Amino acid sequence: MSLDLNSMLKSYESATKSVRATFAAVLDADSFVELDAFITGENELGEPTGEGVVSGFASIGSKDVAVLATNPDVFDGGISALGAKKAERIISRAIESGLPLVSFIDTTGARVLEGIDALAGFDKILAGYARAYGQIPVITVVKGKCFGMLTYLSGMSDAFICYEKAEVATTSPLILSTSGSISCLASDIAKNAGFVTNIVKDDAECKKVIDRLVSLLNDEMADNTDDANRVCKGLSASSDVRSVLNEAFDKNSSIEMKASSAIEALTAFASLDGVPVAVVGVDGKLTAKGASKITDFITTAGSMGMPIVTLVNSTGIVADANQESCCLVRNVSDLIYAYNNVSVQRIALVMGKAVGAAYSILASRSINDFCLAWNGAYIAPFDGASAARLTEGEEIAKAKDVEAAEKKFASIYEADNSALSAARKGYLDNVILPNHTRQYLIASLRAI
C-alpha cells in the first residue's frame, strides 16, 4: 500500500514514541536531527512500521554527539538487517566526524525470522563498535533489556551505563534460569561481573552522567573556577583515596566508574585545573577483580590520551588461593603490562602505604613521570610487623615482652623506609603535606 510523505512520517513517529521520549529527556531540547528515517522495516501487510533502530545527530550539554537507539516498540527492539545498516552508517559517521557515539539499547536481540541476514547485521554493528572504540568516546546506555550479542558492546564502550531495573544477558533469561539462580539485573551485574560502569535511577541522572562523560572524554579543557592553589583542608594522613578524589580535584568534576565492583580499586574521571584526567586509586589489598578493573580503565585512558593520576594506599596483592588458581596472576600481569605500555603522562601519589607489589606496579619511578608521597607515607617490601618477624625473629622470641619487641623492631624498620628516606634515594620527586595535594598534582601535571 502506497503512502504519501506526511502519512509515512506520522506512522514512523508513532512507531518510535519510546525512543523519542528518551531523546526528549536526555538530549538537549529540539537538538535531535534524524538520519536514514526512511530505511524502515515492514509489517506483514507490507506497510512501514518504523524500524528497530533510530539514528542521527544531537547535542548533550551543548556538545555535539552521534546518537543510536534500538526501538523497543518494534518487535521488542529486535534488530533487522535494515536496522543494522542504519546502525553501521551512524557509527561510521561518528568516526568520520570525530563525535562521541551515544547509544541507547533496549532490545531482546536479533529478529529470529531473518535468519543469517540478522546475524550479518550484528556482525556490522560489532565491527563498527570495534572500529569506533579507541578513536572516539563510546557511551552505551541500557534502559530496558539488552539480550544477545549487543551485551558484548560493554567491552567496546568507554562507559556502559544501565538503569537500575535494566536487564543484561548474553542469552535469554529463560535459558539462563535453567542453569541456576542467576540475576540479569544490571545492579547485580555491576557488583559481580564488573562490566557495568554506572547505574542511574532515571533519565535526569542519565543525562547528567552522559553530559559529564562527554565533557571529560572529549579531552577538552573543562570550564573551571576552582583555585589551582586551593588548600585541601579536608585531607589528612588518614584520608582514603575517595576523599582525595573529592577534595583535591576540581570541584564537582569527578565521576566514578564501576563504583560497586572491586571497591578496593577506584577508577574515575575528573579534571585538574580544567585538564581531564583518569584517576586510579587502591585502598588495601588489590584483588584479581580490582586488577582487571584498573587495566580496563587504563586502556580507556590511553585511547583517549588522558593523563593518569594513581593514588596508592595499599599493602600489596591479596593472598587468596582461590583467586590465584583462577585469574589473579593473569590479571595482575595484564595490569603491569597496561601501566608500562600506556602512552600518556602518569603521576603517582603514595598516601599511606605502598608495600611490595603495590609500589612496584602502581607507584614506582619506572612507570610514572612524577612520584609524590605524603609526609609519613611508608614504602617497603613488607609491612613493619612482617619485616620485624623476618629479620629479628630470634630477638623477638627471646624478649620478655614479645609484643613490645615486635613493635619496637617494626617501628625501626618503618622509619628506615619512610617517604623521606625514599626521597633521599631519588625514588620520589617530593614529599608533601596532605592539604597541599591539589597544588602539587596540578604543578606535576603542568610540568609533564
Task: Specify the residue positions occupied by each region the protein language model found.
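Ligand-binding clefts of soluble mixed alpha/beta catalytic domains
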Residues: 1-448
